[in-house]
Amino acid sequence: ADRFRKEMPGIQITVEVMNDRPALETSKDSPLVKQIMKTAQMVGISTEDKGHYFYTDASQIIPEISVPFVIAGPGDDALAHCINEHISLESVRRYAKLYQKYLEKYYL
């Protein structure tokens, strides 16, 4: 806004925050994170523990129930929410296998 005020004297700018949700984090030392990463490696998915700068419904749900969570799914971050966003069927299959193996190993 300051740059525009310098370039266009007299301009009026109003900023309204439409959605201000707190960031969420699950420690990389969390059993859930370790289990998901181990299972991903078992099914041939390369893993990286990292944060993301985007909105997820988890920001409304997780604070209410206080459970650890991870975002793990198919797709390329660089293609998310762009005109030609797409996911390969092979990527969907790999992650379906991850979910299946994770449930079998830790819950069945």
Language-model segment annotations:
Residues 1-108:
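Metal-dependent amide/peptide-bond hydrolase catalytic core
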